[in-house]
């Protein structure tokens, strides 16, 4: 009697499907927007993580910082002169208005006059860089449509700052900040404009200690300093040099014991292939620098090696939450969104 083997193919097909599903479940699909150049960074970056959009239609989002007290992300709209708050329950909402231009200091009408970099100090207060008011200030009452700003520092040797841009606190209670002239930048013509109300003829990087009100000029040799960060041991200061003026975007490393500067990472080659600038940055507890740059978000090791790139589009800044389980980033005017991605 001839055996009927017609059942073999259907059963084999079912086994194959089950096996394929098992393999697929066990092997997450890598996100094509994440490029890994050094496998050691995979201890931090999950190559299968998806990019989430948290907010859009913000004219120029910037200055993201995680507020551990309210479990919220704070960020500003530089062009809209507002500060926003995002959390899992409510999504994005307007939190403080105005944020960076209140009439405190003379400025020009066409500049980028809203706030920019933010930090939460040890007392839980927001310390904010204000382009329009040309100072670093502390916000006393939040949330508010009539916020009270207290000046922390607003001049160098009696001359008003340009447009304080970004800042980072040191473990000794002082903070470092950058002072490029974006309050005098015409976004229509994409040019910096000299004006009689501009008092300083350089773009500085400073240290200010609120305990004794001592202001020190760290360097004035970086033509357009922007994002700023500190190594975990607080011995090295990182400053993003945008390169808009000379075409040489770089990350500058400053030894705070010797005050010697060096080029940590040269972004010129990347800038010839990708859109984006060395704008804001944040430093991971591992010492790796997560910075906006050509191609999106770049991860640079303390030794200056490119570890990874995540294609969020053209970015302005980045930050982590308390336990570094998420990375939050903000986009430029041609990419006006706030994103996050899950980390390992």
Predicted regions: what is each one?
Residues 13-22:
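Hydrophobic alpha-helical membrane-insertion segments, chiefly the h-region
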Residues 11-12, 115:
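N-terminal leader/targeting segments
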Residues 2-11:
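N-terminal Sec-pathway targeting helices
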Residues 1-2, 175:
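Short linear motifs centered on Gly/Pro in flexible linkers and helix caps
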Residues 21-344:
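Sequence-structural signature of mature extracellular/luminal beta-sheet repeat domains
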């Amino acid at each position: 009697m001839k055996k009927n083997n017609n059942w073999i193919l259907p059963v084999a097909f079912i086994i194959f499907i089950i096996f394929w599903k098992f393999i697929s479940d066990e092997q997450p699909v890598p996100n094509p927007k994440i490029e890994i150049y050094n496998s050691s960074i995979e201890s931090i970056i999950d190559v299968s993580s998806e990019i989430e959009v948290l907010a859009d239609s913000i004219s120029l989002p910037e200055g993201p910082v995680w507020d551990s007290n309210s479990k919220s992300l704070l960020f500003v709209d530089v062009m809209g002169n507002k500060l926003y708050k995002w959390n899992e329950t409510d999504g994005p909402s307007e939190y403080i208005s105005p944020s960076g231009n209140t009439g405190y200091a003379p400025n020009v009408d066409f500049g980028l006059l809203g706030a920019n970099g933010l930090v939460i100090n040890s007392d839980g207060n927001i310390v904010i860089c204000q382009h329009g008011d040309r100072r670093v200030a502390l916000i006393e009452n939040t949330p508010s449509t009539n916020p009270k700003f207290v000046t922390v520092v607003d001049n160098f040797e009696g001359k008003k700052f340009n447009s304080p841009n970004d800042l980072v606190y040191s473990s000794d209670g002082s903070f470092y900040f950058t002072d490029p002239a974006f309050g005098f930048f015409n976004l229509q013509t994409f040019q910096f404009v000299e004006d009689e109300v501009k008092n300083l003829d350089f773009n500085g990087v400073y240290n200010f200690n609120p305990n004794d009100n001592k202001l020190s000029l760290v360097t004035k040799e970086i033509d357009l300093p922007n994002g700023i960060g500190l190594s975990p041991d607080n011995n090295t200061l990182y400053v993003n040099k945008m390169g808009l003026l000379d075409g040489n975007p770089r990350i500058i490393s400053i030894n705070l014991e010797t005050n010697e500067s060096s080029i940590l990472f040269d972004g010129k080659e990347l800038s010839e292939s990708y859109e984006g600038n060395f704008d804001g940055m944040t430093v991971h507890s591992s010492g790796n620098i997560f910075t906006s740059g050509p191609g999106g978000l770049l991860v640079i090791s303390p030794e200056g090696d490119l570890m990874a790139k995540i294609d969020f589009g053209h970015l302005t800044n980045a930050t982590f939450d308390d336990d570094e389980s998420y990375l939050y980033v903000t986009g430029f005017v041609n990419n006006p969104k706030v994103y996050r991605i899950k980390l390992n």
